[in-house]
């Protein structure tokens, strides 16, 4: 198996190496295809739990794994310290979003800032013609004769990471390559084993690499302790049903952990961070008719997401990485960039991404943005 990335043999390519099997196989395939590969690993954080914890990324043992893999492949390897940058741009942003009552996606923010901005600059400084990553997403030239690449879902739906890469710009996509986009994970592991790489059976990294044991509140409490300030759990009808231990413990659609004794099932339908209130209500209160976007990104035919909204562009909108896209349209409503669903979506959370795909070509990513607000079918304004 060889990596076809549309560059002449001998071209220099920087491979972003996290120490995991995907990025290692990416580097190995490129080297075997005759490219001048330079491996680069970013040290992003360093807490004690990350040194030996399975599923960590870009710290401790992972850096050693990347270095040993580069030696095995026979390519130069550099480690760059981006810990302070990562803390400022990703970890602190993550904590601040929860303080605002949002549910952030740090992987998207990391791709936006550290990986696809800072690391791309490093790759260019090293004289590279492209940078390759181990993401499961496809970069392809359009079939209509266009000269700009498209971002597309991975061939393996179970591993598709297009949701997390919606903010990739046209300029970044010109420079990026994703050799694993057409492969599935068993094939990648088989390639790693065939190459004699010691990380062939290494566990996949966790979604939030800097959160020890999956307890994100541990990180927030350490750097933003005010997030643990108690407040009221309030029903939509105004009744105070109980107390909570901090708004950072909750997300829209959550049912467990409310610690309230009521007969009917209740869900978190709104978080009023200013008043430290967690608002709960019936499931139907989660149904969302439309949402507004911020920090939009666009790869479609129009020049911008706003222009597409003015055109009433039809889209398939995906509001969680675990959900399939649903039909809707872009619109400008009261000056706000909006997505209006044909039906209704449940549990749409501010801070998450809304990723837009092409209804005529559902694997093609058109762009997206972060969810700034929602309009529910049930009026929540009283809460």
Curated annotation (Swiss-Prot):
Annotated organism of origin: Caulobacter vibrioides (strain ATCC 19089 / CIP 103742 / CB 15) (Caulobacter crescentus)
InterPro entries tied to this protein: MnmA-like, MnmA-like_C, MnmA-like_central, MnmA-like_central_sf, Rossmann-like_a/b/a_fold
Catalysed reactions listed for this entry: S-sulfanyl-L-cysteinyl-[protein] + uridine(34) in tRNA + AH2 + ATP = 2-thiouridine(34) in tRNA + L-cysteinyl-[protein] + A + AMP + diphosphate + H(+)
Entry binding sites for ATP: 16-23, 42, 134
Full protein name: tRNA-specific 2-thiouridylase MnmA
Compartment(s) of residence: Cytoplasm
Function as written in the Swiss-Prot or TrEMBL entry: Catalyzes the 2-thiolation of uridine at the wobble position (U34) of tRNA, leading to the formation of s(2)U34.
GO molecular function annotation: ATP binding; tRNA binding; tRNA-uridine 2-sulfurtransferase activity
Family under the similarity heading: Belongs to the MnmA/TRMU family.
Active site location: 110, 209
Presence of keyword Hydrolase: no
Swiss-Prot/TrEMBL keywords: ATP-binding, Cytoplasm, Disulfide bond, Nucleotide-binding, RNA-binding, Transferase, tRNA processing, tRNA-binding
Any one of the GO BP annotations: tRNA wobble position uridine thiolation
Site note Interaction with tRNA, residues: 135, 352
GO cellular component: cytoplasm
Disulphide-bonded residues: 110-209
Top-rank EC class of the record's enzyme: transferase
UniProt region (Interaction with tRNA), positions on chain: 159-161
